[in-house]
Amino acid sequence: MDRQRSPRLSLDLLRGFRAAARHLSFTRAARELFVTQSAISQEVKTLEEQLGRPLFRRVNRTLQLTQTGEELYRA
Protein backbone atom coordinates (compact mmCIF):
# COMPACT_ATOMS: atom_id res chain seq x y z
CA MET A 1 0.00 0.00 0.00
CA ASP A 2 1.45 3.33 -1.07
CA ARG A 3 0.65 6.06 1.43
CA GLN A 4 1.14 9.71 0.80
CA ARG A 5 3.21 11.03 3.66
CA SER A 6 2.61 14.40 5.21
CA PRO A 7 5.73 16.55 5.47
CA ARG A 8 7.77 16.02 8.58
CA LEU A 9 7.87 19.32 10.40
CA SER A 10 10.87 19.96 12.60
CA LEU A 11 10.51 21.49 16.02
CA ASP A 12 12.96 24.25 15.07
CA LEU A 13 10.76 25.30 12.14
CA LEU A 14 7.69 25.27 14.35
CA ARG A 15 9.43 27.24 17.12
CA GLY A 16 10.44 29.93 14.63
CA PHE A 17 6.95 30.07 13.17
CA ARG A 18 5.26 30.27 16.59
CA ALA A 19 7.55 33.08 17.74
CA ALA A 20 6.95 35.02 14.51
CA ALA A 21 3.19 34.46 14.83
CA ARG A 22 3.18 35.52 18.48
CA HIS A 23 5.06 38.77 17.75
CA LEU A 24 3.91 39.25 14.13
CA SER A 25 7.55 40.12 13.51
CA PHE A 26 10.51 38.10 12.28
CA THR A 27 12.88 40.51 14.03
CA ARG A 28 11.24 40.16 17.44
CA ALA A 29 10.96 36.39 16.98
CA ALA A 30 14.68 36.26 16.21
CA ARG A 31 15.53 38.23 19.35
CA GLU A 32 13.39 35.90 21.46
CA LEU A 33 15.09 32.80 20.04
CA PHE A 34 18.62 34.30 19.87
CA VAL A 35 18.97 33.78 16.13
CA THR A 36 19.15 36.12 13.14
CA GLN A 37 16.11 37.60 11.46
CA SER A 38 17.13 35.89 8.23
CA ALA A 39 17.16 32.51 10.03
CA ILE A 40 13.53 33.01 11.12
CA SER A 41 12.55 34.19 7.65
CA GLN A 42 14.18 31.12 6.07
CA GLU A 43 12.54 28.75 8.58
CA VAL A 44 9.11 30.20 7.82
CA LYS A 45 9.78 29.99 4.08
CA THR A 46 10.81 26.33 4.44
CA LEU A 47 7.72 25.56 6.50
CA GLU A 48 5.48 27.28 3.94
CA GLU A 49 7.11 25.26 1.15
CA GLN A 50 6.64 22.00 3.07
CA LEU A 51 2.98 22.76 3.71
CA GLY A 52 2.39 24.19 0.25
CA ARG A 53 0.58 27.19 1.69
CA PRO A 54 1.52 30.65 2.91
CA LEU A 55 1.41 31.16 6.67
CA PHE A 56 1.80 34.94 6.65
CA ARG A 57 0.72 37.84 4.47
CA ARG A 58 3.55 40.30 4.19
CA VAL A 59 2.00 43.77 3.89
CA ASN A 60 4.01 47.01 4.08
CA ARG A 61 6.75 45.41 6.19
CA THR A 62 4.21 43.93 8.62
CA LEU A 63 3.07 40.35 9.07
CA GLN A 64 -0.49 39.06 9.22
CA LEU A 65 -1.37 35.41 9.72
CA THR A 66 -3.25 33.68 6.92
CA GLN A 67 -6.06 31.29 7.79
CA THR A 68 -3.58 28.40 7.52
CA GLY A 69 -1.17 30.30 9.77
CA GLU A 70 -3.92 30.89 12.34
CA GLU A 71 -4.85 27.20 12.32
CA LEU A 72 -1.24 26.07 12.73
CA TYR A 73 -0.63 28.59 15.51
CA ARG A 74 -3.68 27.36 17.44
CA ALA A 75 -2.80 23.67 16.94
Language-model features, listed with the residues they occupy:
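A detector for short, charged/polar N-terminal pre-domain segments
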Residues: M1-L9, R15
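The N-cap/first-turn positions of alpha helices
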Residues: S10-L13, Q37, G69
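Base-recognition residues in the alpha-helical recognition helix of bacterial helix-turn-helix
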Residues: R15, S41-Q42, R57
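Conserved amphipathic alpha-helical core elements
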Residues: F17, L47-E48
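Short helix-boundary/capping micro-motifs
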Residues: A19-F34
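A short LG(V/I)-centered, amphipathic sequence patch enriched
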Residues: F26, E48-L65
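Alpha-helical residues within the helix-turn-helix
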Residues: R31, Q42, E49, E70
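Residues within the DNA-recognition helix of helix-turn-helix
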Residues: T36, E43-T46
